[in-house]
């Protein structure tokens, strides 16, 4: 009878655990669908992180999960003195599914953060853990004067205790941390650091514990502990983790938490650049910071953040062979926001993009001003126009001089539009009216802009003839924004384009244009933008100053209607 009772209790317990697990999975999936704005984003997130959650297991749990088995394997290896990270899956008795850790490395600057912000930061870490991210914290003490280690040791210890207390001592959930005081070695006070034992980081990570790394190194020559730059520590830690065997982990995010926030932008009135494509924009932004619109001390701090983030993202791309890692620079206050669609770190985990599009016009009142910059190593962007081509600027000449590959351009256009380009007619039409060609990456995307004649006038208007993203990249975060920003910079004064009225992309175009117009009989909608529309609109029939908007719109409609279809 007692055995029957025990079996009954166990059955009830298993059913309750199953209901709780099922409810947790359902709530997680619902929150993901709510926070992502497109089906593609939700799909991309689930494809990357689904192994962290046992989504496919719908039966009541009667034993250890794959994650539990993997965790036990790692801890057993650590206790027996074997390597955790070499041939991890080949040595196990049973073949375990590979579940890589998805890391986010946080560099915390200036620890004078309010208790209220720490509470929000703690909740952000809890959310990240629930979303399958394994955080690693590096505390930054670069503001401490480089005096003797002993002089500042107590200050650093007290700061560490404050951080641990802020993250752990709350009733509404459990965040566990583990301080790592001196895991780096150096020699003769050099700027090169080695991680003594990666197991000290991996074991807590596999147990769901957040390691807190102190920027301290042991000098093997002087046998003394010494300070280290937190950003240098982050760099060498990222390199060591990236060298682990494939499938062990991936560095998804590198986050600088800094009171000064993201990299300032002149275009955005010194609020932050929304998205930085480092391969294309790095040198321009460095030059922009030296123009003199911010104090030198602040400028140097922003330059340091930009330089180190560029180094880190270059390192992770070179080590992994992919551009998956994302950099985020934001403030403690913004990290403490507990809203998936307003917290740029959470939102980026879910969507891999900034909370607003970087190609939205910054002058619009509806465009938020941010203190966060999202950075990617990104793609190279080639811009071809009369300023960098010595001969007659025609499409044929660009092909003849190997400035672009015609076959690859045609393939991109066919792939992007899902139609076959009428090559002969199209290139004959644009050959002598070409204004600008933009090529992103390895023909990942492109734009072709032409000069179109205004009827009854010698004036010309820049017309965005083709804007193409390869199908494989149409969900790639930021690529369309990167190309469109270049288009707008190349023709900032006046630009028009057309799109079929039923095109689902039109919502995106509406947000980036000054206006649009179409006739009832036409299948096309013509969009327009440019600084020309900053002028006062001329409402007088006889006035010569200002912008004659009616005449402009009439010209745009005529151009849009006169251009023949390009695809068969």
UniProtKB/Swiss-Prot annotation:
Instruction: Tell me the residues of the organelle transit peptide.
Output: 1-35
**Reaction equation(s) it catalyzes:** L-glutamate + acetyl-CoA = N-acetyl-L-glutamate + CoA + H(+)
Where does it live in the cell?
A: Mitochondrion
Gene Ontology cellular component terms for the protein in this record: mitochondrial matrix
User: Which GO terms label this protein's molecular function in UniProt?
Assistant: L-glutamate N-acetyltransferase activity
Where does this protein chiefly localize?
mitochondrion
Q: Does the keyword Transit peptide apply?
A: yes
Which keywords describe this protein according to UniProt?
Acyltransferase, Amino-acid biosynthesis, Mitochondrion, Transferase, Transit peptide
- Enzyme class (EC, first level): transferase
A Pfam family the protein falls into: NAT
Which PANTHER family does the entry link to? AMINO-ACID ACETYLTRANSFERASE, MITOCHONDRIAL, N-ACETYLGLUTAMATE SYNTHASE
| Protein name, entry field | Amino-acid acetyltransferase, mitochondrial
Identify the taxonomic lineage of the organism of origin.
Eukaryota, Fungi, Dikarya, Ascomycota, Saccharomycotina
């Amino acid at each position: 009878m007692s055995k029957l009772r025990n079996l009954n209790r166990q059955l009830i317990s298993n059913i309750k655990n199953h209901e709780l697990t099922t409810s947790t999975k359902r709530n997680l999936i619902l929150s993901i669908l709510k926070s992502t704005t497109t089906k593609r984003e939700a799909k991309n997130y689930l494809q990357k992180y689904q192994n962290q959650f046992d989504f496919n297991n719908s039966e009541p749990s009667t034993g250890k999960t794959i994650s539990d088995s993997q965790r036990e394997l790692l801890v057993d290896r650590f206790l027996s003195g074997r390597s955790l990270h070499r041939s991890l899956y080949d040595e196990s008795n049973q073949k375990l599914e590979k579940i890589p850790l998805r890391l986010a490395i946080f560099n915390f600057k200036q620890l004078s953060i309010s208790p209220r912000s720490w509470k929000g930061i703690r909740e952000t870490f809890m959310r990240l853990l629930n979303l399958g991210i394994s955080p690693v914290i590096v505390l930054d003490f670069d503001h401490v004067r480089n005096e003797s280690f002993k002089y500042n040791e107590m200050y650093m210890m007290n700061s560490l205790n404050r951080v641990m207390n802020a993250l752990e001592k709350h009733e509404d959930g459990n965040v566990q941390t583990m301080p790592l005081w001196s895991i780096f070695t150096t020699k003769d006070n050099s700027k090169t650091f080695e991680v003594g034992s990666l197991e000290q980081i991996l074991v807590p990570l596999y147990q769901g514990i957040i390691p807190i790394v102190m920027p301290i190194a042991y000098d093997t020559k002087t046998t003394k502990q010494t300070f280290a730059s937190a950003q240098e520590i982050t760099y060498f830690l990222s390199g060591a983790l990236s060298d682990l065997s494939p499938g062990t982990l991936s560095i998804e995010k590198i986050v600088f938490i800094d009171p000064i926030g993201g990299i300032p932008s002149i275009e955005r009135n010194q609020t932050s650049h929304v998205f930085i494509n480092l391969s294309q924009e790095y040198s321009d932004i460095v030059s922009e910071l030296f123009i003199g619109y911010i104090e030198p001390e602040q400028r140097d701090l922003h330059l340091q953040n930009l330089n180190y983030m560029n180094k880190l993202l270059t390192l992770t791309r070179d080590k992994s062979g992919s551009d998956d890692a994302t950099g985020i620079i934001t403030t403690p206050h913004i990290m403490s926001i507990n809203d998936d669609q307003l917290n740029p770190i959470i939102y980026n985990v879910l969507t891999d993009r900034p909370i607003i599009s970087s190609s939205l016009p910054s002058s619009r009142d509806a465009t938020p001003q941010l203190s966060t910059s999202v950075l990617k190593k990104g793609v190279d962007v080639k811009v071809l126009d009369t300023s960098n081509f010595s001969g007659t600027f025609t499409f044929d000449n660009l092909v003849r001089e190997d400035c672009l590959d015609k076959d690859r351009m045609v393939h991109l256009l066919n792939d992007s539009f899902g139609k076959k380009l009428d090559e002969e007619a199209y290139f004959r039409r644009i050959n002598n009216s070409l204004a600008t060609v933009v090529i992103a990456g390895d023909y990942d995307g492109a734009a072709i802009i032409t000069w179109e004649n205004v009827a009854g006038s010698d004036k010309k208007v820049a017309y965005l003839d083709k804007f193409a993203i390869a199908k494989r990249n149409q969900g790639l975060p930021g690529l369309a924004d990167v190309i469109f920003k270049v288009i707008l910079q190349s023709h900032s004064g006046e630009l028009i384009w057309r799109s079929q009225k039923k095109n689902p992309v039109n919502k995106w175009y509406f947000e980036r244009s000054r206006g649009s117009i179409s006739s009832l009989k036409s299948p096309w909608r013509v969009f327009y933008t440019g600084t020309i529309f900053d002028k006062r609109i001329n409402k007088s029939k006889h006035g010569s100053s200002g912008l004659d908007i009616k005449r402009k719109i009439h010209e745009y409609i005529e151009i849009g209607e006169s251009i023949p279809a390009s695809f068969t």
